[in-house]
Amino acid sequence: MQHSLVFFFAVILHLSHLLHLDASIHPFRLPFSSKPFLLIPMSNTTLPHTAWPLSFLHQTVSTLKAVAVTHSLWHLQIPVDCQACNRKSKKIYC
């Protein structure tokens, strides 16, 4: 059985800008870049990030990375620090 998750948009920020934020974040490296970035999952719900079950976050790491790869491929250039990617992502299966 395949589970699908849809992320409506994602914010990609440099590590140094997120050290003080209370959010569910996942460090990884973007393609074509040697800089480490963090991906914060966003949705159209009103639930805060801290309300997400920990098991849900662990299960979605690969999907979050796939979303970041999708966004980075849409932008031919590497996102600059604090640039938000607000394009709607396509459904990604994991």
UniProtKB/Swiss-Prot annotation:
* Compartments, record wording: Secreted
List the keywords (alphabetical).
Glycoprotein, Secreted, Signal
Which superkingdom heads the taxonomic lineage of this protein's source?
Eukaryota
Report, as the record phrases it, the tissue specificity of this protein: Specifically expressed in adult testis.
Q: What is its main location?
A: secreted
Glycan attachment positions = N44
- Signal peptide interval: 1-18
Query: Has keyword Heme?
Result: no
Q: Does the keyword rRNA-binding apply?
A: no
- GO cellular component, as recorded: extracellular region
Query: Misc remark for this entry?
Result: This putative protein is only present in primates and not in other mammals.
What name is this protein filed under? Putative testis-specific prion protein
Organism, per UniProt? Homo sapiens (Human)
Q: Output the lineage of the source organism.
A: Eukaryota, Metazoa, Chordata, Craniata, Vertebrata
